[in-house]
């Protein structure tokens, strides 16, 4: 197959030398364009009342589903690479590359929403009656993306029925069940973080050193507050320091952390959270450079999915208002708005790491043993 965009602009070039004598597929055959470009069936046209914007609606959603397929393809490969006891530098680099690809795809999907918004509410109303009972709620691939990423069933907002019950065919339900049982990206990243070098109590023991640094940092703040000449200002500062102390206690006390996990306010295990904090502090060390990029990209993915949900919510409100039911029977706008909460944010703990930062000068210094260990780039 030759690419029509790679030549010099001429349709025919008698001097061209074929790279192979084998007969290959031409462009349209390779991409199966006959099937792809014949998959836009306008129901308004079948009803002899063609609505121009229905074609845009179909094309846009088909494009979403194609990109969803690519995201799933990337997630599955990343999960395979993470599902190992040791991940060397080449694999980490490949994981970062593929996560970045997902980020760029999601940016593209966010930017597709304004194209749909070129359609007015009245234009949409002209063909909306043909859509029922179809609904974006029935996008199997988007549900698989959520599950493979790590959205927990118990965290989902439930409307009318369980999310998997909207799929009538058994194959789709099996796909949902398998995606719920298979290790998610969240689970695999958690296992990986738990193995962060430097957490070992018999080694560098970062967590104990971090606690000592926090205690010294807070004590220095208390001493500074006690020198405040205005009593009201002094009491305010002391109260603020005590609140910060309670925040730190939520990560230093395993029982408090586990209670927050059970409540749904945290996602990572206590050990994994320690690993994430350590990588954040020492991200300039060679061994932690790529892991830090990986964690940043996971937050980017969460952020972009949230942006996509938000853009979708605003578009739905523009098209059908906030009171109507969706075409699939869900509460439309109200349901979509409820998915914008932190309960759908998979890597919530990474966003909240900044809560536990301390000044750079207070970060525990690395000893020579761990510094040498962090020069070798495999995690």
Swiss-Prot record:
- Gene3D superfamilies per the record? 1.10.287.3810, 1.20.58.480
Pathway field: Amino-acid degradation; L-tryptophan degradation via kynurenine pathway; L-kynurenine from L-tryptophan: step 1/2; Pigment biosynthesis; ommochrome biosynthesis
Q: Which UniProt keywords apply?
A: Dioxygenase, Heme, Iron, Metal-binding, Oxidoreductase, Tryptophan catabolism
SUPFAM superfamilies, alphabetized: Indolic compounds 2,3-dioxygenase-like (SSF140959)
Query: Record-annotated residues binding substrate?
Result: 57-61, 128, 327
Q: Which InterPro entries match?
A: Trp/Indoleamine_2_3_dOase-like, Trp_2_3_dOase
The catalytic activity of this protein is classed by the Enzyme Commission as 1.13.11.11
Q: Please name the top-level EC class of this enzyme.
A: oxidoreductase
According to the lineage, what is the superkingdom? Eukaryota
GO: which molecular function terms? heme binding; metal ion binding; tryptophan 2,3-dioxygenase activity
Query: Where does the sequence pass through the membrane?
Result: none
Q: Which family does it belong to?
A: Belongs to the tryptophan 2,3-dioxygenase family.
PANTHER family per record: TRYPTOPHAN 2,3-DIOXYGENASE
Write down what this protein is called.
Answer: Tryptophan 2,3-dioxygenase
Q: Which gene encodes it?
A: v
């Amino acid at each position: 197959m030759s690419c029509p965009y790679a030549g010099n602009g001429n349709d025919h070039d008698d001097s061209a030398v074929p790279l192979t004598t084998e007969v290959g597929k031409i462009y349209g055959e390779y991409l199966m364009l006959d099937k792809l470009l014949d998959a836009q069936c306008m129901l308004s046209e079948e009803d002899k009342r063609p609505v121009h914007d229905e074609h845009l609606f179909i094309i846009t959603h088909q494009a979403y589903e194609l990109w969803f397929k690519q995201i799933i393809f990337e997630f599955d490969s990343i999960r395979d690479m993470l599902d190992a006891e040791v991940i060397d530098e080449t694999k980490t680099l490949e994981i970062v590359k593929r996560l970045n690809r997902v980020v760029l795809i999601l940016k593209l999907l966010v930017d597709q929403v304004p194209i749909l918004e070129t359609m007015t509410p009245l234009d949409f109303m002209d063909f909306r009656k043909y859509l029922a009972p179809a609904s974006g709620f029935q996008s199997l691939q988007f549900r698989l993306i959520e599950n493979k990423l790590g959205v927990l069933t118990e965290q989902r907002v439930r409307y009318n029925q369980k999310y998997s019950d909207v799929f009538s065919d058994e194959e789709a339900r099996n796909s949902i069940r398998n995606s719920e049982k298979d290790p998610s990206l969240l689970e695999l990243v958690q296992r990986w973080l738990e193995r962060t070098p430097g957490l070992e109590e018999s080694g560098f023991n970062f967590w104990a050193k971090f606690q000592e640094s926090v205690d010294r940092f807070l004590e220095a703040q208390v001493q500074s507050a006690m020198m405040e000449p205005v009593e009201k200002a002094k009491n305010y500062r002391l109260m603020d320091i005590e609140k910060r102390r309670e925040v730190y206690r939520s990560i230093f006390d395993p029982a408090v952390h586990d209670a927050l996990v059970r409540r749904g306010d945290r996602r990572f295990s206590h050990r994994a959270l320690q690993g994430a904090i350590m990588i954040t502090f020492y991200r300039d060390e060679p061994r932690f450079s790529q892991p830090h990029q990986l964690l940043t990209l996971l937050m980017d993915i969460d952020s972009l999915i949230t942006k996509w949900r938000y853009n979708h919510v605003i578009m739905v409100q523009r098209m059908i208002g906030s009171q109507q039911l969706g075409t699939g029977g869900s509460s439309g706008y109200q349901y979509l708005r409820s998915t914008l909460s932190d309960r759908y944010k998979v890597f919530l703990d990474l966003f909240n790491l900044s809560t536990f930062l301390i000044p750079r000068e207070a970060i525990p210094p690395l000893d020579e043993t761990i510094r040498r260990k962090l020069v070798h780039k495999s995690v």
